[in-house]
Amino acid sequence: VVIFPLGLDRNCLPIEMAAEKKYNVSPFDVGREEFLKYCESPLHLYLHIPYCPKLCWYCICNLKITSDRKEIQFFLDHLLKEIDNLRDFYEKNDRTSAIREIHFGGGTPSHLDRLQFANLCGHIRSMAYDISEWAVEVDPRTVNEADLLFYASEGVTRISFGIQDFDPGVQKAINREQPPELIEALLSP
């Protein structure tokens, strides 16, 4: 879970600030104090889903290739605990969540099944009440029209398709083959 103030450099995260300041307290305490400074300003929540069904050879993302649903669920269970901890943090510090934007990236968040995705969204909604944008990156090879409608029903307002190139030769070279017809079908009403 990565949270940063909207409009600030996204590399400016509390843990990095804590490391630079060399406090004589635990990083958690420093992170908490730094976060309290920003937690009522509009915030952006980024959730990294590090799983993909297939490796694209150009990819430098932190990811794991797997179709093991138990492994993905194990990760998701821990991510949900992190979200619960954040919600509890707001409550214990008598604060209201100022999360205004949410972005799921990866890997590919579309590698989550619908139940997993809905559970994740429900946990987020338990602490984020005024979301202006909810974005999800998807691998167009892993979704269909029904999936896109499902994402919308969960509150997603923007979908980014991972289209790297339309040239079949380039697609083959990067191990990301997706015919233009596939994209056209997803974008056509």
Placement of each model-derived feature along the sequence:
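Flexible, acidic/Gly-rich N-terminal and inter-domain linker regions that tether
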Residues: 1-46, 53-54, 93-96
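Generic recognition of cysteine residues
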Residues: 12, 39, 59-61, 121
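Local cysteine-cluster metal-coordination motifs and their immediate loop/turn environment
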Residues: 47-63
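Conserved non-cysteine loop/helix-boundary elements of the Radical SAM core domain that shape
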Residues: 63-89, 99-189
